[in-house]
Amino acid sequence: MTVALTRRERQRAATVEEIKEVARGLMREQGTTDVRFTDIAKEMGMTPPALYRYFADRDALLTELIADAYRELGREVAEAREQCDPDDIGGLWIAVGTAYRNWARRESEQFALILGMPVPGYVAPEDGPTKDAAKDAMAQLSLLFIRAAELGVLQEPLVRDVSDEMAACAAEKHPEQGGLVPPESFQAMIQAWATLHGITCLDAYGQFDWMTDEAREALFVSTLRTSALAAGIPID
């Protein structure tokens, strides 16, 4: 049974959300690398010391913002997967990649916060919410490869040589694969994500602004298809 919050608890939760929203707004104006309590307090009509009643320090606020961003990205990608035929692995890859790119273009500051330039001086807590949120968001990609393996349609990747270190890392850090995804395919999955992330960054940060929208879209889909074929994902 859900316990109702007291009035004070509701007010505190609302203020926490307002602080985070103001911080996101400032990041949209001045970037993600210079988040300061003084600026947030000024926007909210508060004194900087008052913010410490809600967040222990700037890093605690950044941790919440990063975790929120990963969760939002994960939800967007998961929703895209759910709208596809679960047996159409190629279609799922295009849908996942497109959702990833669309979110990055729409939320470029949040994208930069979690997958762009590190914020100077910030170190994520070792076992904090950012690690779990990031893992959950990126699990959408590994689930796609696991599904392909379950269906028996995961093909050998273009590059099949994999180091012992990479194979050990796959087994240790991603036990959810349960041996279904061989090391060479795990490596190909990381390479496919790197390709998706690379072209998304170029697009989100204006490097393709000289292209028409149609040309950008065609290039993006073509790149996803190329990376799928290299990774052993069946695609039409």
Residue ranges and their predicted role:
Residues 1-14, 235-236:
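N-terminal intrinsically disordered/low-complexity leader segments
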Residues 123-129:
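Flexible, glycine-rich active-site loops centered on histidine and acidic residues
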Residues 115-122:
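Short linear capping/connector segments at secondary-structure termini
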Residues 18, 26, 30-60, 64:
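Helix-turn-helix
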Residues 15-23, 40, 65-69, 73, ...:
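Generic hydrophobic, amphipathic alpha-helix propensity
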Residues 22-29, 72-83, 195-202:
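Solvent-exposed, amphipathic alpha-helical segments
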Residues 64, 80-110, 131-140:
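Hydrophobic alpha-helical connector segments
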Residues 139-236:
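C-terminal peripheral helix-coil segments that are non-catalytic and often amphipathic
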